[in-house]
Amino acid sequence: MPTFALNFSRPAGQIVSQYYNFLRLGFEGYRKVQNACYHIAQHFAAELRKMGPFEIIHDGNGGLPAVCWTLRDGGDHGFTLYDLSDRLRTRGWQVPAYSMPPAREDLVVQRILVRHGVTRDHTDLLLEDIQRALALFKNHPVSRNLTKTEAGGYNHN
């Protein structure tokens, strides 16, 4: 069965410090931290949606404080998410584009995860760089899109 997993590997020292923070902050403190992450993710999704070419798959409301998007169906956007990922990398962002597992390999997505420490200022800077990339693609359409292999990224297979 095809799956879509989020894998994280963290050193044990960070687990110990997280446990300490949980004891220090308590349930209510952790709830506030997580709610702040959700609000930032929802703000990012709302602003990204306004840009036009993106279809929001998950807007950070419930579940993980993450935003996942793809390009809207129909029409030639003049770029792929692989192209956008590459362009964002030149500005210092790592927002990979990748296709889904078998049975949905036709769907290419990008996503961000909002963790503690990511601020609205950070996401606003990312939104500005996405807008800058869209303007570049509009003025200088990509004549040959990057392939999945050329763009690199993560494979969930």
Please give the residue ranges for each predicted region.
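Conserved C-terminal alpha-helix-loop-beta "cap" of PLP-dependent enzymes
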Residues: M1-F8, F22-N157
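Catalytic-loop motifs flanking and including active-site residues across diverse enzymes
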Residues: R10-S17
